[in-house]
Amino acid sequence: MAKRSRGPGRRCLLALVLFCAWGTLAVVAQKPGAGCPSRCLCFRTTVRCMHLLLEAVPAVAPQTSILDLRFNRIREIQPGAFRRLRNLNTLLLNNNQIKRIPSGAFEDLENLKYLYLYKNEIQSIDRQAFKGLASLEQLYLHFNQIETLDPDSFQHLPKLERLFLHNNRITHLVPGTFNHLESMKRLRLDSNTLHCDCEILWLADLLKTYAESGNAQAAAICEYPRRIQGRSVATITPEELNCERPRITSEPQDADVTSGNTVYFTCRAEGNPKPEIIWLRNNNELSMKTDSRLNLLDDGTLMIQNTQETDQGIYQCMAKNVAGEVKTQEVTLRYFGSPARPTFVIQPQNTEVLVGESVTLECSATGHPPPRISWTRGDRTPLPVDPRVNITPSGGLYIQNVVQGDSGEYACSATNNIDSVHATAFIIVQALPQFTVTPQDRVVIEGQTVDFQCEAKGNPPPVIAWTKGGSQLSVDRRHLVLSSGTLRISGVALHDQGQYECQAVNIIGSQKVVAHLTVQPRVTPVFASIPSDTTVEVGANVQLPCSSQGEPEPAITWNKDGVQVTESGKFHISPEGFLTINDVGPADAGRYECVARNTIGSASVSMVLSVNVPDVSRNGDPFVATSIVEAIATVDRAINSTRTHLFDSRPRSPNDLLALFRYPRDPYTVEQARAGEIFERTLQLIQEHVQHGLMVDLNGTSYHYNDLVSPQYLNLIANLSGCTAHRRVNNCSDMCFHQKYRTHDGTCNNLQHPMWGASLTAFERLLKSVYENGFNTPRGINPHRLYNGHALPMPRLVSTTLIGTETVTPDEQFTHMLMQWGQFLDHDLDSTVVALSQARFSDGQHCSNVCSNDPPCFSVMIPPNDSRARSGARCMFFVRSSPVCGSGMTSLLMNSVYPREQINQLTSYIDASNVYGSTEHEARSIRDLASHRGLLRQGIVQRSGKPLLPFATGPPTECMRDENESPIPCFLAGDHRANEQLGLTSMHTLWFREHNRIATELLKLNPHWDGDTIYYETRKIVGAEIQHITYQHWLPKILGEVGMRTLGEYHGYDPGINAGIFNAFATAAFRFGHTLVNPLLYRLDENFQPIAQDHLPLHKAFFSPFRIVNEGGIDPLLRGLFGVAGKMRVPSQLLNTELTERLFSMAHTVALDLAAINIQRGRDHGIPPYHDYRVYCNLSAAHTFEDLKNEIKNPEIREKLKRLYGSTLNIDLFPALVVEDLVPGSRLGPTLMCLLSTQFKRLRDGDRLWYENPGVFSPAQLTQIKQTSLARILCDNADNITRVQSDVFRVAEFPHGYGSCDEIPRVDLRVWQDCCEDCRTRGQFNAFSYHFRGRRSLEFSYQEDKPTKKTRPRKIPSVGRQGEHLSNSTSAFSTRSDASGTNDFREFVLEMQKTITDLRTQIKKLESRLSTTECVDAGGESHANNTKWKKDACTICECKDGQVTCFVEACPPATCAVPVNIPGACCPVCLQKRAEEKP
């Protein structure tokens, strides 16, 4: 009983729980703006309204995805009942009382997939009932009362997979009812009363198709006739239903009519079921409903009443039933009236046809007289005489056995004596895919990238699809199908091994081809043979064995003392890795390292090579004395001849212009270059004497230079040539100076290696040099010599074939300032000293006249088919760079011949040497030493109140090449190339003004500082600004994100890093900037519109400082740099023709070619080929030109390289670097990015005085330095630039992208204020605080410059005298360390009293000097205060308070074609006009 009593209680409790749950669920669904229908169950996006006796569809929330309305009393669905329910996925309407489905019943249900309508009372379905259900997959209509279906009922359901129509009352189905259901998988028509007669045969064919494909299941059972009741519709045949195809019993005949008559075309047919008669005119079905003149009689006859001209044409009768169709012969209705021009009755239509089939293009026309039909190709060319091509009697074009060549346009012409008309159509020949490139079996190493090439043709063009083992490829980033059809698998893994299938698919069919991939595991390199320590005699050849094994096959490289060895006349590396050294000399002694490297890892082994130099005489020893005398004489004669030619007249050709531009101005540089030339010329003369005496040819690469002369004679040659006399001995003892400031020549930056990065030292090498003879002969100097089976191409041919372009693509991101900063920076880093002579040493003839390769000439030959050759030019002027004495030897004895090295005239550091010079001599020439304010010299003052650079003095310069343009000389700056082009000159003007601006501010903040202190502090700030702009603003745009990651963050100074510029950087890599140069220098006014003088072609901007003076100053040029897009480097658009065809051009002369010069300079410097740098940068070795496709994707460029060089091992470095595809986000290719990131990392990390190195600047000062931007420099130092973009390297739209200069952050120089209690001696280079540290190394970095040492300290020199400096008193004290402290102090006091007396004397002298207001001009002549004098015809100078200010007259544009200079007059005049003005 107890158990029984608990039952009802439990049931009540359960009901209560369910009730609560129902309420809770209903509440859950009631979100703001989306109420749940009354009594419905709502949970999230599901709404269930079952068993609620609903008679209409309730309103539900738009986010509803499942709507359940089963078991209600809904009788009809109103159009729009489900509007806005775009998220609905499932709709359940079964078990209701719906009788019909109207049009638009399910509007807006575009995402509905499942629709349940079974067990209703549906009798009819509108043909548009299911329109809009594009996503519907399942439709359930079974157990209804449907009797008929419109054939278009299901045409709007492309994704329908399941359709249930069983248990309805369907008796007949119209053909085509299920035609559009391409995705059908299951169709049920069973349990209907299907009448299986001839009209249902279409359904039988459909069901058979389903069964054969296996993609769909279908059920349909015959109910009638009784004899086949219960049979599947799919099994019935036309024969058992007695169905007969139509057959024609009476055919129509041709007819001729006139206007307004009636014509009859007879057509009778029989068949079962009775066929339907359809009439066609010109292959188009006639509609009896649209034209009342047309009538179809009961027997099938066509009657046309009131005939018109438009009725003429080709008629045909078609009889059709479910068993088939048949057509009568074509008949013609001809219409006759008055003479009429031809009109087409049938125009040809575009027709698709398969290869091998036949095709007919119908064409007929009427007219009076009847027109003649003819056919041609679409371009009016006649049809080919081919038995396959015929014209039918009715005028159609018939082609049988169609081939692919028949594809194209055809024209039908109808002609009578009134007119002719034409109509065209295309025959589109469709063909199965055919493979043109098939994939090959590949064997690769794990981790590599493999390409399976697969290409096919066909019509339509096929699509390439790849599978592996019949299955789809893995969906990951490693598998990529390129647009060409190639399958690329990156980072191949072992499980990628297997069979791959390439399928070419089009609408006609598909073809398949297979390839197999075999993956081998990776193996770290293991040495098979290793070298051992070896001793050889000088002059011998030695082979060092080294080979290794591994997977992938390791690449063998050799290093000597940290520099990679490359293939040359000196070194040869065999395929297995053995290193052969030819003509071993003492310079070859050292440690050699063999490195085996693959993608898995690397292994290395080293050995020591010792060279034994026997004390025996050599063949060249007897000729040393005569050769050195002859060498000195011939070199000096050639140099003097060149000097006379260049400096005693104006430049007459681009050759003169280039030579004058590159000629070193510093006397020390000239002497050092001269010594190197004499040293090398002596060896060449000795070689010639030995060769003549032995009567053998020693000019090949097999000649042993170390057998030429004995070591003691080699040292004698070095002494007599002047090499040892100009060997610098640096002095870095003045640590008070060197810890704070840079020397001008870059010495003592690295205190462990003081010459690292110094000016006038040899370029560094990443790879060993490559010379034909291993010593000094460039590659390609012998045009008949083969390299890897091919001759090297002429540099000019490479330029015209590969590099030069007239097309320029603007850079969408960066301005032309990106290029200009790169050039300005380059002139801070490197400048090669070229030969001092333009004439060959052997006979003194000019290099451009003889076109030979005799030293120092190395002419750029012009190919026979070149445009310049047609004008008679044989070569372009080129002389070799001057060699370093002994080629980089640093010991006191030169006992071996070293490969030729070149001189970097500048300091390697980013230290603003382009502003201040790279030697003490250069620095003093541009300083304003008279004012004692630490300023740089300034030139004429413009209307803006800001000065230009001072003019250079001396003989005629490159800027005065055309006396008809202007007599204005070159500007003087820290780098002698400042006048090369006007954009560069503008940058030099900016930074010279920036120095003077900062120096003026520092003097205001620290009036107690002397001129030297202000100068060096300002120079330090300016150098830091250039460093910051370069690394923070410019380099990220050049290197991109990838390159900046390679460069890495700054972690402090590393004294073990040599910051020197490596030769390949200066000669090839950093010359990539030439590809960024625009052919125009834009000049814009303050509204960023062209100035009156317009933009300037680049060839008119070379050496033209007069344009800055006379044509608006520097502002228009600067706006043209930051206001105009730069040139984008496109692999097919490299150097514009202003640089390759008009470089330094002058009237009636052959201009130079910068691209050809770059290539020739690389060979001159022994730069290894591109392939060696690929290996250095860890790129794959390129044995074929196809191996370059990852870095040079353009096949046309690879083909050009192949035609030019023949072998990848021959490609010069510069052209290869500039044709590499850009790494995304950068302006460099991968090899170029490697080289630049390597160099800039060394420049930063190997610079002890780098601005970010702790202690160089105080934290507060460093914070201010980091406010620097080039935009701020422009605002502060341009003439009147007031609006710029914040980043002048990025393209901005004017005016919206430009802001006021007031918004650009500036450097606050107040943090440089020297806060001191007694400032009388602070900041004085000659003050007491500096006395004890001495200034010996400041002025005398080299031992030979130091005056003779005296036993007593010298007197403090006069401020005005040069060449005298304080002695280092600390060294004097150290020699008396054993004296007592009392004596030391007494001597100290006596010395201090003497120092004070000397200082007073100097102050009196200085006051006396400053009290005079006379001026001394550049010629040493004195002028009284407030006097004026003419310096030349155009320049008037004035003496004002001891300062000389000169003004240059600006000449107006000449009004005649040929103005003439008159002696004593500044501006050219027009003589003709003067003559006219005379009475």
Curated annotation (Swiss-Prot):
Keyword rRNA processing: no
Binding sites annotated in the UniProt record for Ca(2+): D828, T907, Y909, D911, S913
Outcome of substituting C1316S: Does not affect protein homooligomerization. Loss of protein homooligomerization
Post-translational events: Glycosylated. Four sites are completely N-glycosylated (Asn-640, Asn-731, Asn-865 and Asn-1425), whereas the others are found partially glycosylated. Processed by FURIN and the proteolytic processing largely depends on the peroxidase activity of PXDN. The proteolytic cleavage occurs after intracellular homotrimerization and releases into the extracellular matrix a large, catalytically active fragment and a smaller fragment consisting primarily of the C-terminal VWFC domain. The processing enhances both peroxidase activity and sulfilimine cross-links formation.
InterPro entries linked: Cys-rich_flank_reg_C, Haem_peroxidase_animal, Haem_peroxidase_sf, Haem_peroxidase_sf_animal, Ig-like_dom, Ig-like_dom_sf, Ig-like_fold, Ig_I-set
Disulfide pairings: C36-C42, C40-C49, C196-C243, C198-C222, C267-C317, C363-C412, C454-C502, C546-C594, C723-C885, C732-C748, C847-C857, C851-C875, C959-C970, C1177-C1234, C1275-C1301
Activity regulation as described: The hypobromous acid formation is activated by increasing nitrite concentrations and inhibited by increasing urate concentrations.
LRR repeat boundaries on the chain: 61-84, 85-108, 110-132, 133-156, 157-180, 182-204, 1151-1175, 1270-1291
Record remark: domains: The VWFC domain mediates the covalent links between monomers through disulfide bridges. Ig-like C2-type domains are required to sulfilimine bond formation. The VWFC domain is not required for trimerization. The LRR domain mediates high affinity binding to laminin-1.
Catalytic residues, chain numbering: H827
Residues of the Ig-like C2-type domain: 246-332, 342-428, 433-520, 521-610
Note accompanying the cofactor annotation: Binds 1 Ca(2+) ion per subunit. Binds 1 heme b (iron(II)-protoporphyrin IX) group covalently per subunit.
Residues carrying Phosphotyrosine: Y1176
Any one Gene Ontology BP term: protein homotrimerization
Role description: Catalyzes the two-electron oxidation of bromide by hydrogen peroxide and generates hypobromite as a reactive intermediate which mediates the formation of sulfilimine cross-links between methionine and hydroxylysine residues within an uncross-linked collagen IV/COL4A1 NC1 hexamer. In turns, directly contributes to the collagen IV network-dependent fibronectin/FN and laminin assembly, which is required for full extracellular matrix (ECM)-mediated signaling.
Biased composition (Polar residues): 1365-1380
Region span, Disordered: 1342-1380
Positions of the record's site feature: Transition state stabilizer: R977
Species this chain originates from: Homo sapiens (Human)
Name the UniProt record assigns to this protein: Peroxidasin homolog
Chain positions of site Cleavage: R1336
Subcellular location: Secreted, Extracellular space, Extracellular matrix; Endoplasmic reticulum; Cell surface; Secreted, Extracellular space, Extracellular matrix, Basement membrane
Pfam families: An_peroxidase, I-set, LRR_1, LRR_8, VWC
